[in-house]
Design a protein with these regions (language model features):
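Extracellular and analogous surface-interaction loops
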Residues: 27-38, 129-135, 174-177
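Autoprocessing Asn-cyclization modules and mimics
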Residues: 154-222
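Extended, solvent-exposed segments with strong compositional bias
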Residues: 85-133
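Surface-exposed turn/loop modules enriched in turn-prone residues
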Residues: 49-105
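Beta-rich globular "head" domains
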Residues: 27-67, 181-186
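Viral structural modules
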Residues: 1-33, 183-191, 197-198, 208-211, ...
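Short, flexible beta-strand-to-coil junctions
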Residues: 46-52, 59, 67-74, 144-153, ...
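C-terminal interaction-tip segments
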Residues: 1-18, 132-157, 224-237
Length: 237
């Protein structure tokens, strides 16, 4: 039986707002994948949001896979520990205690058929799908990513009217909400204040949340979807 698992790592709003990602930067640190079924990953679809509503000029990026179960009969090793951090997101790898947690990797290569992203037909995001993989999965699964060039998630969608915690309405300005956001997006402002989950986008200046706004965010604060990169993993029993 074939299974599909959606993976939604978080890249905090303040990290996205700070600067574009550069070659060899950590895109996101270890994210535990819940609900994965199967003993190996056979295929991966990657969905990458654009820069302020416009699709990215895509670059290569590398996915790393790991497990907390470090077990080797040869050396008599049996340790259960989640993979330690790679380092600071939006900077290079700087810590290295994850070495024995690794189980595999995959490189999305913009120059290779079957590994590269679409050419911008979707306007606001880029997508790539690859298959024929056999990345082993241990007792659990973690995923992290390193970019091989510039990826930019910076936004100029700004709070137009100070948000209020007694309403689901969010008014924005400067850049269109229809281009940048969609139902299901989780919004934070540039200082990582939680705004809420988008229920609908009425027009370029009006967003409706699933629940009342979680925080009071000031006028002119930039808003971010904290899940600009998502993956769908395919596997078989």
């Amino acid at each position: 039986m074939r299974h599909f698992t959606k993976v939604i790592p978080t890249i905090t709003a303040s990290i996205q707002a700070g600067a574009a990602f550069a070659d060899e930067d950590i895109l996101f640190d270890w994210h535990k994948v819940d609900g994965f079924k199967g003993s190996e990953i056979n295929g991966i679809t990657a969905i990458v949001r654009g820069t302020n509503g416009a699709d990215q000029t895509m670059v290569d990026f590398e996915l790393l896979f790991a497990t907390s179960g470090i077990k080797e009969d040869t050396r008599g090793v049996s340790v259960d520990v989640a993979p330690p951090s790679l380092g600071t997101v939006n900077a290079g790898v700087s810590t290295y205690q994850w070495k024995n947690n690794l189980t595999g990797h995959f490189l999305f290569d913009v120059d290779v058929e079957g590994k590269k992203f679409n050419d911008g037909d979707l306007d606001v995001l880029n997508i790539a799908t690859t298959s024929g993989l056999n990345i082993p999965v241990g007792q659990d699964l973690y995923i992290a990513a390193i970019t091989k060039g510039a990826l930019d998630f910076r936004s100029t969608v700004q709070v137009g009217t100070e948000t209020a915690t007694n309403t689901t309405a969010v008014v924005v300005k400067t850049t269109g909400a229809l281009l940048n956001f969609a139902p299901g997006d989780v919004l934070h402002d540039e200082n990582d204040l939680v705004i809420g989950t988008v229920k609908s986008v009425t027009d370029d200046t009006n967003i409706v949340l699933a629940e009342n706004c979680a925080s009071v965010s000031a006028v002119n604060k930039d808003l971010y979807n904290i899940h600009p990169v998502q993956f769908i993993l395919s596997s078989t029993d």
